[in-house]
UniProtKB/Swiss-Prot annotation:
Keywords: ATP-binding, Cell inner membrane, Cell membrane, Membrane, Nucleotide-binding, Phosphate transport, Translocase, Transport. It comes from Pelagibacter ubique (strain HTCC1062). The lineage of its organism: Bacteria, Pseudomonadati, Pseudomonadota, Alphaproteobacteria, Candidatus Pelagibacterales. CDD domains: ABC_PstB_phosphate_transporter. Pfam families: ABC_tran. The gene is pstB. The complex is composed of two ATP-binding proteins (PstB), two transmembrane proteins (PstC and PstA) and a solute-binding protein (PstS). This is Phosphate import ATP-binding protein PstB.
Length: 255
């Protein structure tokens, strides 16, 4: 791979939910302005891992996180860290589209407003337009900005959620199975969008679709039972994996 800049680095990351350990000594490097796909069976720790990156696990009382995650060499597993400031750097797109019960415009303007990015209406209009353009949605909704975001189709709602995520100008976008609730046509649009977004953002995508990982990512990490089994270029993982467990998973022998 040409890109050698590590954006996110996880070292000896362990996560417990009460007595249950969800992640075991996870070491994983995520490179800048690339798509890294995380694959593995359900319940193997993929979503837990990405929720550590934006500290969403903080809201779970029984969750205990140990180890290190750095973004641009800054430690984020730190109780004194400004979590709001961290989340300004990290956009999150969930499994099912979850637009706010607000207008299309307000869905996008909400993040920049709470983060204090601008109080100027003209500047906010520009943020909304640019975010929707980056999410390949502007032409479909530019005359409907005052309509409810929940009135859009499923695929449009997910692109609205992507526009909402990038409206605060993040450095990283986390996607937790963003196409699992979408039809093939809507999925193709999201995948085209991911390919375009990686020019500006570091993207981590959790997916159960092997073919999707091949199509959209430059690197792939395989999780199993809370451990990172193998991580390499996507081409190497799918054409010549170095671990038999990886080979068995991608060929459908277990999962």
């Amino acid at each position: 791979m040409k890109n050698n800049k590590i954006k996110i680095k996880s070292s000896n990351l362990n996560v417990h939910y009460g007595e249950k350990q969800a992640l075991f000594d996870v070491d994983l490097d995520i490179y800048d302005k690339e798509v890294t796909a995380l694959i593995g069976p359900s319940g193997c720790g993929k979503s837990t891992f990405i929720r550590c990156i934006n500290r969403m696990n903080d809201v779970i009382d029984i969750c205990k996180v140990e180890g290190s995650i750095t973004i641009d060499d800054e430690e984020i597993i730190d109780k004194n860290l400004d979590v709001v400031g961290l989340r300004e750097k990290i956009g999150m797109v969930f499994q099912k589209p979850n637009p706010f019960p607000k207008s299309i415009y307000d869905n996008i303007s909400y993040g920049p407003t709470i983060h204090g990015l601008t109080e100027n209406k003209t500047d906010m209009d520009e943020i909304v337009e640019n975010s929707l353009k980056k999410a390949a949605l502007w032409n479909e909704v530019k005359d409907r900005l005052n309509e409810a975001g929940t009135g859009l189709s499923g695929g449009q709602q997910q692109r609205l959620c992507i526009a909402r995520a990038i409206s605060v100008n993040p450095q990283v976008i986390l996607m937790d199975e963003p196409c699992s609730a979408l039809d093939p046509i809507a999925t193709a649009k999201i995948e085209e969008l991911i390919d375009e977004l990686k020019k500006s953002y570091t993207i981590v995508i959790v997916t159960h679709s092997m073919s999707q990982a091949v199509r959209v990512s430059q690197r792939t990490g395989f999780f199993h039972l809370g451990k990172i089994i193998e991580v390499d270029t996507t081409e190497k993982i799918f054409k010549n994996p170095g671990n038999k467990m990886t080979q068995d998973y991608i060929t459908g022998r277990f999962g």
